[in-house]
A protein has these predicted regions:
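Conserved G1/Walker A P-loop phosphate-binding module
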Residues: 1-76, 80-82
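Conserved glycine(s) of the Walker
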Residues: 17, 156, 247
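Conserved C-terminal guanine-recognition region of P-loop GTPase G domains, centered on the G4
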Residues: 52, 76-144, 217-219
Length: 294
């Protein structure tokens, strides 16, 4: 039996639906999703296994002009997506006209590997607008195969996955056949808490936050978690905690509910808030939190 395996890397502007697409492919909620830009900070692998294939999907941060060291590290994750891909997915949304970084766009149109351009959120368009967008992207990225999809509604997602399987090279599996991702449990705890902060706080607060899980103890029925929420200033610490701890308690309750669904066990979670001044511009702290891969 012929076995296929390969890396399928997803890139695009912020908030075009990259994480929604990967979750749809994998069938699990590996990447957190919010309406805020820069929700995805790391490169996250999701693995889909079949008897004769292994598809390794990579969700990457949205492409931006970096303003500080953490964002530079995020863009390094995107650059690495060009280096090991067997198939490249360039994801755009209805109404979008260009990638925010010309250098990345040039890499796409000169790619030596198959490129699938997925025109997402077509449920928000009419037929005339859709046809105009398809013509636009055919001209801009002539080397790409174009698929109109709705990742949220699962429209055309199976068709795209079938095409990916056709394009993958013959290869043995790269990961164990029961693997779902390359990330450890603590990573998903951190991301779940960060998602709830993104959903519950406004302005700069969500972007100044990093999560570190110091304790993850699992037995047959319960997982005990101790996590620290890092912020950059004392004022941010006060906002995260809220009046009499109400805001932090709300985040903890929401995170616990999602983590119990994810792990299938009862969760006991403790969260604390600490000030870690200017961590987003500290190379030492970025390495500690898994951003700096150099």
């Amino acid at each position: 039996m012929i076995h296929k395996a390969g890396f399928v890397n997803i890139i695009g502007n912020p908030n075009v639906g990259k994480s929604t697409l990967m979750n749809a492919f994998v069938g699990e909620r590996l990447s957190i999703i919010t309406s805020k830009a820069q929700t995805t900070r790391h490169r996250i692998l999701g693995i889909v296994n079949g008897d004769d294939f292994q598809v390794i999907l990579s969700d990457t941060p949205g492409i931006i002009k970096p303003a500080y060291e953490m964002q530079k590290s995020m863009m390094d994750f995107v650059k690495s997506a060009f280096e090991d891909a067997d198939v490249l997915i360039y994801m755009v949304e209805i109404g979008e006209k260009e990638l925010k970084d010309e250098a990345f766009f040039n890499k796409i149109i000169h790619a030596k590997i198959p490129v699938l351009l997925l025109l997402n959120k077509i449920d928000k368009s009419d037929q005339e607008q859709l046809e105009e967008q398809i013509d636009l992207w055919k001209e801009k990225v002539p080397n790409a195969e174009i698929y109109p999809i709705s990742a949220l509604e699962n429209f055309n997602v199976k068709e795209v996955f079938a095409r990916i399987l056709e394009l993958l090279p013959e290869s043995p599996a790269y990961y164990p056949k029961d693997a779902l991702t390359d990330k450890p449990e603590r990573f998903f705890v951190n991301e779940t808490i960060r998602e709830k902060i993104l959903l519950n706080y406004d302005k700069e607060i969500p972007y100044a936050v990093e999560i570190e899980t110091e304790e993850f103890i699992e037995d047959d029925k319960i997982i005990r978690i101790r996590s620290v929420i890092m912020v950059e200033r004392d004022t941010q610490k006060g906002i995260i905690i809220g009046h009499k701890g109400a805001a932090l308690k709300r985040v903890g309750m929401q995170a616990r509910e999602d983590l119990e669904k994810f792990f299938g066990k009862q969760i006991h979670i403790e969260m604390f808030v600490k000030v870690n001044k200017d961590w987003r511009n500290s190379q030492f702290q970025l390495r500690r939190f898994g951003y700096n891969q150099k």
